[in-house]
From Swiss-Prot:
Residues 1-53 are annotated as: Disordered. SUPFAM superfamilies: Homeodomain-like. PROSITE patterns: ANTENNAPEDIA (PS00032), HOMEOBOX_1 (PS00027), HOMEOBOX_2 (PS50071). GO terms for biological process: anterior/posterior pattern specification. This is Homeobox protein Hox-A5. It comes from Ambystoma mexicanum.
């Protein structure tokens, strides 16, 4: 290869060639990919009980963009115990809004963070608002149907 010619890349690097040889055919590309896959499986120790093979149908369908959910990724959904839910519902029944002091007390009593308590109450208020809107609409519709 001439010193001034940098258009040729070794096919051993897995990047293919840019000179018009027969290695540019689609079949050759498939053979190169097959060699790379076999080589990478050997390097990962696949035969020694490594991670299971991931087939194309097991991969994610949607491409995620970098740093949308922050560096940690998507937060897992909190699963509240029945006891926690019952206590939160009881508190909501008496007061739909919490003071900071009461939020801290509940968080310590239920072993949850203040943030979880705050968000639970926000979500519960939205549910309450939606339920009341549906009730008022159904009562208005029922009242209109029974007029003499």
């Amino acid at each position: 290869v001439a010193v001034g010619s940098s258009s040729h890349i070794s096919s051993r690097d897995g990047l293919g060639t840019s000179s018009g040889t027969e290695d540019d055919t689609p079949g050759a590309a498939g053979r190169r990919e097959g060699k790379f896959t076999a080589r990478s499986e050997r390097t990962l120790g696949r035969a020694g009980g490594g991670p299971p093979q991931i087939y194309p149908w097991m991969r994610k369908l949607h491409i995620s963009h970098d740093n949308i959910g922050g560096p940690r990724g998507k937060r897992a959904r909190t699963a509240y115990t029945r006891y926690q839910t019952l206590e939160l519902e009881k508190e909501f029944h008496f007061n739909r809004y919490l003071t900071r002091r009461r939020r801290i007390e509940i968080a310590h009593a239920l072993c949850l963070s203040e943030r979880q308590i705050k968000i639970w109450f926000q979500n519960r208020r939205m549910k309450w608002k939606k339920d009341n809107k549906l009730k008022s609409m159904s009562m208005a519709a029922a009242g209109g149907a029974f007029r003499p």
